[in-house]
From Swiss-Prot:
Gene coding for it: TTR
Function per UniProt: Thyroid hormone-binding protein. Probably transports thyroxine from the bloodstream to the brain.
Subunit details: Homotetramer. Dimer of dimers. In the homotetramer, subunits assemble around a central channel that can accommodate two ligand molecules. Interacts with RBP4.
Name of the featured protein: Transthyretin
PANTHER family assigned: TRANSTHYRETIN (PTHR10395:SF12), URICASE AND TRANSTHYRETIN-RELATED (PTHR10395)
Cited SUPFAM superfamilies: Transthyretin (synonym: prealbumin)
Family the entry assigns: Belongs to the transthyretin family.
Species annotation: Tiliqua rugosa
Length: 150
């Protein structure tokens, strides 16, 4: 009987300890914002805050026209950079000011900035999430693109 009680107490404790923490909502794939960025600091293992980000679109003349900018928040994210009306089919560039970020931490980085150039498709509302993983001498990017939403 004593071992059965101990087993039940242990199981109850495990259930309590494995309960997931509540999700803090700071954006989702269902957001009306068609473009979101997320930046992580691979050295410190946390979101990269206060990184300046510029978004540009290739013009018909072949040059980049900046149309949005911002700084990453406490989660390393920027939401609502643009609207569906502005974010039409075309070639886009997201520029991360990585040099200023590392220099503010007392690190001399190799890269001045990191660019992600991609094509956006207007076949319905899509949500683009551009993620960057940074270190002073390298960076990696990835994208998540939702299916078109009508």
């Amino acid at each position: 009987m004593g071992s059965s009680s101990l087993l039940l107490v242990c199981l109850a404790g495990m259930v309590y300890l494995t309960e997931a923490a509540p999700l803090v909502s700071h954006g989702s794939i269902d957001s009306k914002c068609p473009l979101m960025v997320k930046v992580l600091d691979a050295v410190r293992g946390r979101p990269a805050t206060s990184i300046a980000v510029k978004v540009s679109k290739m013009s018909e003349e072949g040059d980049w026209k900046e149309f949005a900018n911002g700084k990453t928040n406490e989660f390393g994210e920027i939401h609502e950079l643009t609207t569906d009306e502005q974010f039409v089919q075309g070639l886009y560039k997201v520029e991360f000011d990585t040099s200023s970020y590392w220099k503010a931490l007392g690190v001399s980085p190799f890269h001045e900035y990191a660019d992600v150039v991609f094509s956006a498709n207007d076949s319905g509302h899509r949500h683009y999430t551009i993620a960057a993983l940074l270190s002073p001498f390298s960076y990696s990017t990835t994208a998540v693109v939702s299916d078109p939403k009508e």
